[in-house]
Design a protein with these regions (language model features):
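Solvent-exposed, non-transmembrane regions of membrane-associated and secreted proteins
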Residues: 1-168
Length: 168
């Protein structure tokens, strides 16, 4: 559940064409969505797909936003801590970071192109209790910031900040 996008996105195991057409896909070689130190669960989704929004408006997500991951075993609440734009082959950006419990969403960037990847990196918030959708949406309304997002852009070993408008 991504409240800022008002999006319940089903997540499937493996980034196959079929799974990506139906929702988000847990990337192979990344952590299972169980939480815990030394994990990074990486979920890829299209930035829109044949009429389905999916992560179409990913640029609206802002630092501090909540993302809730529900599995058959647990409900984990994460808070967005970083926004990044990377090259498609930059696997370093999705590696486990020692001691951290991360959830990373990845999608194509810019919209309608696939020359880069837009990452939303969120860290587990063990003190946050799951809320109702209405409570989450109210929090989003209260915290909306229309200012451009400060996004870290990593290209060919260099890092820069770029402003990305929340509305495309």
């Amino acid at each position: 559940w991504i409240p800022r996008l008002n999006l319940d996105l089903p997540v499937y195991l493996g980034a196959s064409t079929a799974n990506m057409a139906r929702g988000g896909a847990l990337l192979g070689q990344t952590s299972m969505p169980l939480g815990g130190a030394n994990t990074n669960t990486v979920i890829a989704a299209h930035r829109g797909y044949y009429g389905a929004e999916m992560l179409r408006n990913v640029q609206q997500i802002q630092l501090g936003d909540k993302i809730t991951l529900t599995t058959p075993w647990d409900t984990l609440v994460y808070r967005v801590c970083e926004l990044k734009i990377i090259q498609p082959d930059d696997i370093n950006a999705v590696l486990i970071q020692p001691g951290r419990d991360l959830l990373t969403l990845t999608t194509c960037h810019p919209y309608t192109q696939n020359t880069q990847r837009y990452l939303v990196i969120a860290e587990h918030d063990p003190d946050a209790a799951p809320a109702t959708h209405a409570e989450d949406l109210a929090e989003c309304d209260e915290t909306w910031d229309a200012a451009p997002r400060q996004v870290t852009v990593e290209t060919d070993g260099t890092t820069a900040l770029e402003e990305v408008a929340p509305e495309s």
